[in-house]
Amino acid sequence: MCSPIYSNNPPENGYDSKLEKHFISLLSDATVSDINAKLTFVKHGIYLFIQYKEMGYVVNSFPEEVFWNMVNGLYRLIHDCSDKILELFLQVVKKDGFQAIKPFKQTDAHKVQQFEDAMEFIKDIENMRIVHFHNMKTDSITDKDKERKVEKKFQKILNNTIGPKSEAEWEHCITWIYKNCKNIQELLEERIKFLQTEATEEQRKLLCEKYYSCIRVYYNGIMFEIIKEILRKKRESYKDCTRILALVKENEEDIANKAIVLIQNADRRADPYLAALQAADIILTQKKQI
């Protein structure tokens, strides 16, 4: 095997064209940063992907290994609240009487399947990541339902009953990831362009309100780690789980509210994670709990 080539952008000095589909642009820091920076109709910006840091993998490795590294990277990209934000941006808007309270125009009939495929792909990645990585832990409880879903998905991708075995079959699965990631990028670009150039003020307002709701869900999931990080930065004990849980229980709503206010009042792009850290510092300091 030739010297390793790392993802997620093709090297400038060229590469084997057979590896074209091994480079997933959606997994690169540059692409994620670009997407996060494109919505400027509000000063604080809209982060579609939060806390993502690219983890390169060897592109010219064995196809099976490349595939699972892609799955792992995509799971990291969409975990926490990013899947909820993607669900917001990739929703199908139907003429069902509720389209007036949606942040996007009615979805064209010929585009509906693309959006549905994108959301299905996100669920597939979650299932594959859990089945392949989580179920390998000795203390994990095997999720039989997800296992069956993954088996059926592989069968559908390959049109067989045994799943991927050969290198060619794993390459076919990589192509499946590549095409779906390309589809998601195209749909996000379309929705971002609409919000920037065509959306009404009411649609933009609805988008922001739903975005804040997604952020609140995100904060509920990471509040323990937020407070733990503040204690670490203040050089206080951050290994006392009982204390941290007590601080979370007493302060999580106040911290989330403060973080949202900080985001809304920001005169520049505001990273929701950094806003939560700042809010936790302010609230805990005001209450003299740190």
Label each residue range with its predicted role.
Residues N159-C173, I177:
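Post-HExxH zinc-binding segment in Zn-dependent metallohydrolases
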Residues I130-I141, T175, K182, E186-K193:
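Charged/polar positions within long, soluble alpha-helices
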Residues R216-L262:
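Acidic, Ser/Thr-rich low-complexity intrinsically disordered segments
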Residues D108-E116:
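Conserved short strand/loop->alpha-helix "switch" segment adjacent to the catalytic nucleotide/phosphoryl-transfer site
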Residues F115-L158:
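Histidine-centered, metal-coordinating catalytic motifs and their short helical/loop contexts
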Residues G56, N60-P63, E147, E151, ...:
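Alpha-helical rod/repeat scaffolding segments in eukaryotic adaptors/tethers
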Residues I5-T107, M119-E120, K179-Y218, I222, ...:
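Amphipathic alpha-helical interface elements
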